[in-house]
UniProtKB/Swiss-Prot annotation:
<feature type="modified residue" description="N-acetylalanine">
    <location>
        <position position="2"/>
    </location>
</feature>
<dbReference type="GO" id="GO:0005813">
    <property type="term" value="C:centrosome"/>
</dbReference>
<dbReference type="GO" id="GO:0000931">
    <property type="term" value="C:gamma-tubulin ring complex"/>
</dbReference>
<keyword id="KW-0206">Cytoskeleton</keyword>
<dbReference type="GO" id="GO:0005829">
    <property type="term" value="C:cytosol"/>
</dbReference>
<dbReference type="GO" id="GO:0033566">
    <property type="term" value="P:gamma-tubulin complex localization"/>
</dbReference>
<comment type="similarity">
    <text>Belongs to the MOZART1 family.</text>
</comment>
<dbReference type="GO" id="GO:0051415">
    <property type="term" value="P:microtubule nucleation by interphase microtubule organizing center"/>
</dbReference>
<dbReference type="GO" id="GO:0090307">
    <property type="term" value="P:mitotic spindle assembly"/>
</dbReference>
<keyword id="KW-0963">Cytoplasm</keyword>
<dbReference type="Pfam" id="PF12554">
    <property type="entry name" value="MOZART1"/>
</dbReference>
<protein>
    <recommendedName>
        <fullName>Mitotic-spindle organizing protein 1</fullName>
    </recommendedName>
</protein>
<dbReference type="InterPro" id="IPR022214">
    <property type="entry name" value="MZT1"/>
</dbReference>
<keyword id="KW-0007">Acetylation</keyword>
<dbReference type="GO" id="GO:0005819">
    <property type="term" value="C:spindle"/>
</dbReference>
<comment type="subunit">
    <text>Associates with the gamma-tubulin ring complex (gTuRC) consisting of TUBGCP2, TUBGCP3, TUBGCP4, TUBGCP5 and TUBGCP6 and gamma-tubulin TUBG1 or TUBG2; within the complex, interacts with TUBGCP3 and TUBGCP6 to form a luminal bridge with actin that stabilizes the initial structure during complex assembly. Interacts with TUBG1.</text>
</comment>
<dbReference type="GO" id="GO:0031021">
    <property type="term" value="C:interphase microtubule organizing center"/>
</dbReference>
Length: 82
């Protein structure tokens, strides 16, 4: 009987942890929107995971900015040739 209550407690703790993660991501997404970062939930989630793995947030920000510039340049060049 004790093992089933232990499993129930573990499931409840896992559910509470998942809810906390979701709430944290919702708050981060709202901050991201306020700061007008243009990041969607999936991209923001990837950035958070990269930072958790030790990637420097400032370096990550620089890479994102450079990728956006390169994308805009490619779009502009594509529009010139069409």
């Amino acid at each position: 009987m004790a093992s089933s209550s232990g499993a129930g407690a573990a499931a409840a703790a896992a559910a509470a942890n998942l809810n906390a993660v979701r709430e944290t991501m919702d708050v981060l997404l709202e901050i991201s929107r306020i700061l007008n970062t243009g990041l969607d939930m999936e991209t923001l989630s990837i950035c958070v995971r990269l930072c958790e793995q030790g990637i420097n947030p400032e370096a990550l920000s620089s890479v994102i900015k450079e990728l956006r510039k390169a994308t805009e340049a490619l779009k502009a060049a594509e529009n010139m040739t069409s």
